[in-house]
Amino acid sequence: MKLSQILTFASLLSGALAAPGKPHGKPGFASTSGLQFSIDGQTGYFAGSNSYWIGFLTNKADVDIGFNDVNTVPGEGTVYYQLHANGKSTINTGANGLQRMDYVVKSAEKHGIKLIINFVNNWDDYGGMNAYVKGYGAADHNDFYSNAKIQKAYRQYIRAVVSRYTKSDAVFAWELANEPRCKGCDTDVLYDWIKSTSEYIKSLDAKHMVCIGDEGFGLETLSDGSYPFTYVEGSDFARNLAIPTIDFGTFHLYPDSWGTSHEWGNLWTQAHGAACQAAGKPCLFEEYGVTSDHCALETPWQKTSLNTTGVSADLYWQYGDTLSSGPSPNDGHTVYYGTDDFKCMVTDHVAAIKAKQGWV
């Protein structure tokens, strides 16, 4: 999701997955099994949340409760991971850089949480792709996908992150980007970038899964012709999903931003389930949210997702909690722990998952 005040950003910990019951097996690398995910000895449907802000926390205790490209060095106390300046890329491996992510991963390992680690953001919040565009003198946003200097710096960051966590079972998947778009582009542009980047990641780490992080745009299956189903944003969901080095599909849902009805979200979910079923890969309903009436509007999507063949997990946007500094960021979509919204969106949803699958 694009946020004007806060971010979904480069080096994002975009999602956290947890089994809706105590794992029956030993911790290990997450994988796919047909149209489902397998996590720590369980195969089935899983639930989780998006918590982009965890990677920026400076208080380790806050991490236990619960990333950023720049063109100039931020002020003291700001976490950032990569600096683009004077045509050069510098990876910040210090205490206010990747060492922060180290602790997030360590905490996830300790608490049995699986992380989706994202490498760049389509949007400008906290830098994103346009930080690369500006840093290497490219013309516009869409140059990110094919500019040689940009891709060299992007892969430098990928290598720096992947190499730190190749042995961590807390990593659910590596994600190419948050909501990559190439408006007005031929679909070959994103396809070629997805194919080459996912192949590169697999060459560094063949054990962890790789996903795109896209919104699911560009799909013929069950299409009603509305904007999200079109190819305007340069994406072809089914074609991209068929790339061998992409392990599962991702799709998002924000009707208020896309000009669709809330009920339409059920069609969108079913369409992607059908596309993933045709591809023989599971789908992750990776982001969804509204700014009000969470229980009334979002729980029907959860029920549809749980009962749609081809969809094997969902992550609502976004998790909220009370930190040492106060409440975690709230963009209006936030569902805070301990609230009535949390009960319907999480507690009741997990109970439904457990009941459907016979998990205790």
Curated annotation (Swiss-Prot):
| Top-level class of the enzyme under EC nomenclature | hydrolase
Query: What is one Pfam family matched by this protein?
Result: Cellulase
Q: Which residues form the active site?
A: E179, E287
Q: Which GO terms describe its molecular function?
A: mannan endo-1,4-beta-mannosidase activity
Is Glycoprotein set as a keyword in this record? Answer: yes
Q: Give any single GO term for biological process.
A: mannan catabolic process
Q: Mostly located where?
A: secreted
Instruction: Quote the EC number.
Output: 3.2.1.78
Provide the alphabetized UniProt keywords: Carbohydrate metabolism, Glycoprotein, Glycosidase, Hydrolase, Secreted, Signal
Q: Which family does it belong to?
A: Belongs to the glycosyl hydrolase 5 (cellulase A) family.
Q: What is this protein called?
A: Probable mannan endo-1,4-beta-mannosidase A
